[in-house]
Amino acid sequence: MGGGGYLEDRVIHPTLTLPNPTHSGYFDYDKKSQNPKSPLNPWAFIRVKNEIVTLEESLFSMLPAIQRGVIGFNDCDDGSKEVILEFCKKFPTFIPISYPYEVILKDCPSLWHQLYHYSNYTLSFIPKNEWVIKIDGDHVYDAKKLYESFYIPKSIKEVVMYSRINFVVQDFEVFVCNSGDFGFLDAWGDQWLFYNDCEPFEIWQHNGEVLETWQHNDDIYEILKLKDKHHIKDKELMQWHFPLAKKRRNAIVDNDLIPLKEFKKHHADLIGTRIEESMLDEKRILEMYQKFNLAKG
């Protein structure tokens, strides 16, 4: 499937001129974070569709680590658009980008309705040859750990691959989705910090090649090929993912759930090395969950 994956079909924008950040954060403690070419000052690359339940908590959680970003949104009818516009008004170094086409996952009538073209449209607002981190609206971030991860890459050829755990809360008890290695998705490959000199997103067509980085979204695959890049694992877990909190997913029943205590017992070797124990504190996770906009879920 060709078209939107090529430069001549992309919408190219002039370099965005942003004001200085109006918010403070960990980036204030290192002058190198003021350099727009530094990995300590990446652009947040965010795409949103109906994530009202977790969105506000997610955006504010990453704010002490990230100074600037673009937030693409489409087909929002749950209040997510209004949250984004208000957030960007309050923090003008984040740019709201309304995608003017419906994204259709099956039997798509044109490339403009393709998920990968929506991704390219949003990404095209970020200047080339600067650092980018993918941020998701159903993740909550430990901002200190997130910012510290920006020190990992030592060259523009390195890509940081982030790990995650998918948390589910049922009846005030925390579970982990049994995916990856007994619930631990180790540098899974759909969240990354990278230098923006790569080719645009493409539709995934599996022909036997090994894909460096891929993203799964329901029944459609898209990839961002990071050629000639060296992939580096994150040093420690810096986020919580709540995949079933989304409005369109909250009716999904996941019967393959691991109680948090079992996860901690199974992965005892990771606690204190790849996962700080406080990241798995049930009280902390429940307090976080209760801050979500659950009434609109």
Residue ranges and their predicted role:
Residues 67-78, 97-99:
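Short beta-strand/loop segment that forms part of the nucleotide-sugar
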Residues 23-31, 50-69:
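Short, well-formed alpha-helical segments that are part of the catalytic scaffolds
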Residues 17-39, 79-131:
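Active-site-proximal specificity loops/subdomain of glycosyltransferases
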Residues 39-60, 75:
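Active-site beta-to-alpha loop of glycosyltransferases that engages the nucleotide-sugar donor
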Residues 1-32, 109-120, 140-297:
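Catalytic-site signature of metal-activated, phosphate-bearing donor transferases
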Residues 129-142:
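Short beta-strand-to-loop acidic/aromatic patch adjacent to the donor-nucleotide binding site
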Residues 57-61, 83, 145-149:
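A short acidic, amphipathic alpha-helical/loop segment
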